[in-house]
């Protein structure tokens, strides 16, 4: 994941995606998530548009096939989303998202995933996106 993080910094206009497979892949990347993804912009003023696809393990295969604990990533978020309203989502200023350190989404269909990826590339600033997915 360190390679993908570095690539997303050097090539900010590309869609850089890292996918954790079954098992403990996200746990091995936790150091990079804590030190670079969650706090990289506040520490070093470096923006990253890295997308992380993490399996949630709630689709019947059991917790041993999960690389994602949703509550862990929600606890890593700062308070930028506290002021999120419907009007701020519909407008183009994205101020609550600019104040947060990353976004966590759980897309329910392919259209939602397309627009989440599209938003990652089309914005004039970069924030990491953590996408909670199933492995089906």
Predicted features by range, described:
Residues 1-136:
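Conserved thiamine diphosphate
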